[in-house]
Amino acid sequence: MGLETEKADVQLFMDDDSYSHHSGLEYADPEKFVDSGQDRDPHRLNSHLKLGFEDVIAEPVTTHSFDKVWICSHALFEISKYVMYKFLTVFLAIPLAFLAGILFATLSCLHIWIIMPFVKTCLMVLPSVQTIWKSVTDAIIAPLCTSIGRSFSSVSLQLSQD
């Protein structure tokens, strides 16, 4: 990794048709210049938390405070929201992420190894249980209900007003 003393010979060939005399900034995608950081909420799970000062504090037209008070309270609101969020995430984000990971791992394990095998077993057994239940219903419960229904169908009530 020493000092290079040789000259590099570089040439660039461009067609006149493909060469644009514009800088290209006016044609660029504006989203590339907004924020190059990753989107931490791609599914918009917390879109309801995007609250501004005007969403929380609102003065009607008839009652306005002094402009300096409004500006200072707006600045204090934004700064305190920013600082408190950073402070809370420093102390709570890692432990809560750890606990959430344990919780979701436990729930996943229970779902995969206990709940789904139980459900699949029940679904495998249910056709035979259904056949047995239908036989019991046809042999015992249906005749019993039929005889009770016939007994009560012969009962008649007569009301008289005396």
Curated annotation (Swiss-Prot):
Q: Any keyword Nucleus?
A: yes
Q: Pfam families given for it? A: Caveolin
- Record carries keyword Phosphoprotein: yes
How does this protein lie in the membrane? Peripheral membrane protein
Q: Where Phosphoserine occurs, residue numbers? A: 20, 23, 36
Q: What does the UniProt keyword field contain?
A: Cell membrane, Cytoplasm, Golgi apparatus, Membrane, Nucleus, Phosphoprotein
Q: Name one GO cellular component term.
A: cytoplasmic vesicle
Provide the GO MF annotations for this entry. Answer: D1 dopamine receptor binding; molecular adaptor activity; protein kinase binding
Which family, according to the similarity comment? Belongs to the caveolin family.
Protein name, entry field: Caveolin-2
